[in-house]
């Protein structure tokens, strides 16, 4: 696989392609300064990123859209050069809500289509505008999932030209098989966005996805920010790992660059999230070196099956994906 800063798209099973590195745009709406996301996306595009990963529930898609449109207006990129991934949240799984939800994202972005639209989690929550619905006692309000019905509504969005490719996120093997074996399947999921890094290499899920032509996109590819609401903070920080740092010295790279290179060398798309402008540039400098087979094996051996993003608050949901081995 010949990847370079100028040319690093890999094929998807539907004939489209995806840039192997993207900018993640997740942010805490309350603590992120206005405009930080737009600035980050503009710097990323100037740096060479062509893949932006976002979601309506990040509450910053308007900034992402503004940045993309500004770079198109400047003549820096064309719309077809940019790959935008949007997400269908858990409160919008009801089939008749899928298209209006995507159309709302398109209105916010002020774009005609998204390149990839994915079901963000396999768990359905009570439909409505409340992103995290709970009752008066703080108990989560779930909704019965029907992933196949939701998928059919996604397929209709692709047929209508609102999205080029369809995928999923946080799906385990059983949930992927539900879609793959669906009678009358029109469009296969092209990707599954999951946590993936040297402490959580996902060998079995990766193999299953490769057998079915499903690309793995790695969120939290550098470990993760250590927010105790979401993250198992007892887990060791990935970027302090001795092996990753010694490889960094060998190649005159940071541990983060080694980690990103490791995943792209195995065909895993990475979407490191950063609003730090220097780090955005640094994360992209991974095309001017490659790891040896031996080094790849050494990094693979770091796997501890440590999942940072456990989503434990939803572990009693019938479709909670992480009870299964993979």
UniProtKB/Swiss-Prot annotation:
Q: Name one GO biological process term.
A: digestion
Please name the catalytic residues of this protein.
Answer: 58
Result when mutating residue 58 to A: Loss of activity
Cell compartments where the protein resides: Cytoplasm
User: Can you tell me which residues bind substrate?
Assistant: 26, 58, 89, 120, 132, 230
Q: What class of enzyme is it?
A: oxidoreductase
Matching entries from SUPFAM superfamilies are given as: NAD(P)-linked oxidoreductase
Q: Which GO terms describe its cellular component?
A: cytosol
Q: Which PROSITE patterns match?
A: ALDOKETO_REDUCTASE_1 (PS00798), ALDOKETO_REDUCTASE_2 (PS00062), ALDOKETO_REDUCTASE_3 (PS00063)
Query: Where is this protein chiefly located?
Result: cytoplasm
Q: Which GO molecular function terms does the record list?
A: aldo-keto reductase (NADPH) activity; aldose reductase (NADPH) activity; Delta4-3-oxosteroid 5beta-reductase activity; ketosteroid monooxygenase activity; steroid binding; steroid dehydrogenase activity
Q: Which InterPro entries does the record associate with it?
A: AKR, AKR1D1, Aldo/ket_reductase_CS, NADP_OxRdtase_dom, NADP_OxRdtase_dom_sf
Catalytic activity as recorded in UniProt: 5beta-cholestan-3-one + NADP(+) = cholest-4-en-3-one + NADPH + H(+); 4,5beta-dihydrocortisone + NADP(+) = cortisone + NADPH + H(+); cortisol + NADPH + H(+) = 5beta-dihydrocortisol + NADP(+); corticosterone + NADPH + H(+) = 5beta-dihydrocorticosterone + NADP(+)
Q: In which tissues is it expressed?
A: Highly expressed in liver. Expressed in testis and weakly in colon.
What does the annotation give as the result of altering residue 261 to C?
In CBAS2; decreases protein level; accumulates in inclusion bodies; lacks of 5-beta-reductase activity
Spell out the activity regulation. Answer: Subject to inhibition by high substrate concentrations. Inhibited by testosterone concentrations above 10 uM. Inhibited by the primary and secondary bile acids chenodeoxycholic acid and ursodeoxycholic acid.
Q: What family does this belong to?
A: Belongs to the aldo/keto reductase family.
- Disorder cited: Congenital bile acid synthesis defect 2: A condition characterized by jaundice, intrahepatic cholestasis and hepatic failure. Patients with this liver disease show absence or low levels of chenodeoxycholic acid and cholic acid in plasma and urine.
Any idea what job this protein has? Catalyzes the stereospecific NADPH-dependent reduction of the C4-C5 double bond of bile acid intermediates and steroid hormones carrying a delta(4)-3-one structure to yield an A/B cis-ring junction. This cis-configuration is crucial for bile acid biosynthesis and plays important roles in steroid metabolism. Capable of reducing a broad range of delta-(4)-3-ketosteroids from C18 (such as, 17beta-hydroxyestr-4-en-3-one) to C27 (such as, 7alpha-hydroxycholest-4-en-3-one).
What PANTHER family does the database record attribute to this sequence?
ALDO/KETO REDUCTASE
Name by which UniProt lists this protein: Aldo-keto reductase family 1 member D1
């Amino acid at each position: 696989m010949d990847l370079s800063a100028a040319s690093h798209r890999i094929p998807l099973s539907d004939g489209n392609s995806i840039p192997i590195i993207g900018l993640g745009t997740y942010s805490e709406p309350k603590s992120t300064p206005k405009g930080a996301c737009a600035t980050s996306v503009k710097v990323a595009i100037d740096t060479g990123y062509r893949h932006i990963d976002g979601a309506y529930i990040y509450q910053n898609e308007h900034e992402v859209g503004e940045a993309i449109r500004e770079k198109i207006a400047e003549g820096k990129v064309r719309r077809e050069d940019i790959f935008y991934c949007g997400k269908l949240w858990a409160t919008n799984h009801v089939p008749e809500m899928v298209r209006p939800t995507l159309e709302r994202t398109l209105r916010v972005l002020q774009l005609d289509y998204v390149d990839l639209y994915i079901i963000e989690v396999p768990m359905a929550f009570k439909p409505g505008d409340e992103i995290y619905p709970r009752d008066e006692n703080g108990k989560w309000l779930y909704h019965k999932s029907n992933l196949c019905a939701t998928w059919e509504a996604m397929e209709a969005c692709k047929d209508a030209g609102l999205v080029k490719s369809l995928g999923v996120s946080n799906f385990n093997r059983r949930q992927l098989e539900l879609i793959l074996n669906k009678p009358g399947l029109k469009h296969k999921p092209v990707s599954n966005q999951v946590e993936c890094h040297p402490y959580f290499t996902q060998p079995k899920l990766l193999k299953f996805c490769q057998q079915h032509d499903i690309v793995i996109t790695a969120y939290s590819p550098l470990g993760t920010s250590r927010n105790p609401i979401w993250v198992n903070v007892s887990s060791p920080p990935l970027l302090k790992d001795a092996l990753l740092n010694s490889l960094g010295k060998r190649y005159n790279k940071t541990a983060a660059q080694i980690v990103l290179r490791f995943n792209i060398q195995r065909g895993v798309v990475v979407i490191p999230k950063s609003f730090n402008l220097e780090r955005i540039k640094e994360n992209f400098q991974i095309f001017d070196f490659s790891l040896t087979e031996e080094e790849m094996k050494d990094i693979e051996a770091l796997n501890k099956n440590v999942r940072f993003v456990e989503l434990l608050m939803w572990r009693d949901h019938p479709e909670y994906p992480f009870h299964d081995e993979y």
